[in-house]
């Protein structure tokens, strides 16, 4: 949903609960992966499959056991937001094409500011086609990496699996996981730098002296889904609302619907995952299928 300035707020208020770690420190850990979120980040210049393969190799090198969780059907509250995102992708693609044409035809010199604009447009215009998602699933399956499809949104199920003890943490850049109450979140997972940043929600709540329900309410009130004009930030809520023990709710019905959307108490009933018996573990590899998927994406193998 987008929570304005939440990350900056947490870094300033709770630095001791946010730690940079090497991937070696994740050895033997079981992690749930917000699949769509990671695939978007890996799909740089259309190189999704090579980047995903490199990520799989890294997981296996450190014996990190991942479970990729793919999105299911989004809730009604988010369908309008998805339409907006599709519109933004189209606009970004048009702006990107126009900008690149200007750079080429007008000999515009590249600088850091221009590169930043290009990078932002590239990220915004990126979309995952069903073909790419299916190819990613084929590669995961061939390499023995488990994956499941959530009934609704992946982040909800990811938080449920972490909080149920099935996984140690969730890998995602989606700040919604904090609103879901996910106890441990891994951001900035870097295959090339071999490190990541771990957020501990229990430490964050303790430092802020907040209950999860209050923290979730703060996230919702300053979210893009609730406050569309973009004026409310975490700082506003923290300094003006919570400090005075009062919080102004403009649209109570919308607020309650969004808060309920982030409660994960019934996700186990909607999921095929039985936390009492479910185990995240590597499956058997299918070398021929792996080779086929990679060859379809430009890999060349020496048959000798």
Regions inferred by a protein language model and the residue ranges of each:
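Extracytoplasmic/secreted cell-surface and envelope-processing proteins
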Residues: 77, 179-180, 229
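Short amphipathic alpha-helical interaction elements and helix-loop-helix interfaces
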Residues: 142, 146, 164-167, 225
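Non-catalytic nucleic-acid-binding/docking modules located in mid-to-C-terminal regions
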Residues: 13-27, 31, 62, 193-304
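A short acidic, often aromatic-flanked loop/helix-cap motif at beta-alpha or helix-coil junctions
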Residues: 153-157, 193-194
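Noncatalytic, basic helical substrate-engagement surface that gates or grips nucleic-acid strands
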Residues: 2-13, 25-150, 157
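A short alpha->loop->secondary-structure connector
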Residues: 86, 185-192
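Acidic, metal-binding active-site segment of PIN/NYN-like and related structure-specific nucleases
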Residues: 158-188
């Amino acid at each position: 949903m987008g929570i304005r300035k939440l990350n900056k707020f947490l870094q300033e208020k709770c630095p001791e609960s946010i730690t940079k770690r090497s991937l070696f420190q994740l050895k033997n850990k079981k992690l749930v992966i917000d699949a769509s979120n990671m695939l978007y980040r890996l799909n740089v210049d259309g190189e999704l499959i090579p980047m995903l393969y490199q990520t799989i190799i890294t997981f296996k090198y450190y014996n990190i056991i991942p479970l990729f969780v793919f999105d299911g059907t989004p809730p009604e509250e988010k369908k309008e937001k998805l339409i907006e995102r599709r519109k933004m992708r189209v606009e970004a693609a048009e702006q990107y094409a126009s900008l690149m044409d200007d750079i080429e035809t007008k000999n515009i010199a590249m600088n850091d500011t221009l590169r930043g604009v290009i990078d932002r447009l590239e990220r915004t215009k990126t979309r995952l086609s069903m073909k790419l998602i299916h190819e990613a699933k084929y590669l995961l399956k061939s390499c023995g990496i488990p994956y499941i499809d959530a009934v609704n949104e992946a982040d909800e199920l990811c938080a449920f699996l972490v909080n149920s003890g099935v996984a140690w943490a969730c890998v995602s850049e989606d700040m919604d996981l904090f609103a879901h109450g996910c106890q441990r979140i891994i951001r900035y997972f870097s295959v090339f730098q071999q490190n990541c940043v771990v957020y501990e929600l229990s430490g964050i709540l303790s430092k802020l002296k907040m209950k999860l329900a209050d923290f979730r309410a703060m996230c919702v009130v300053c979210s893009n889904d609730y406050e569309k004009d973009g004026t409310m930030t975490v700082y506003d809520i923290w300094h003006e609302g919570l400090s005075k023990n009062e919080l102004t709710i403009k649209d109570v019905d919308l607020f309650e619907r969004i808060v309920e959307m982030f409660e994960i108490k019934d996700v186990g009933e909607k999921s095929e995952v039985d936390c009492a018996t479910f185990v995240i573990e590597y499956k058997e590899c299918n070398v021929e299928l792996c080779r086929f998927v990679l060859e379809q994406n430009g890999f060349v193998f020496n048959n000798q």
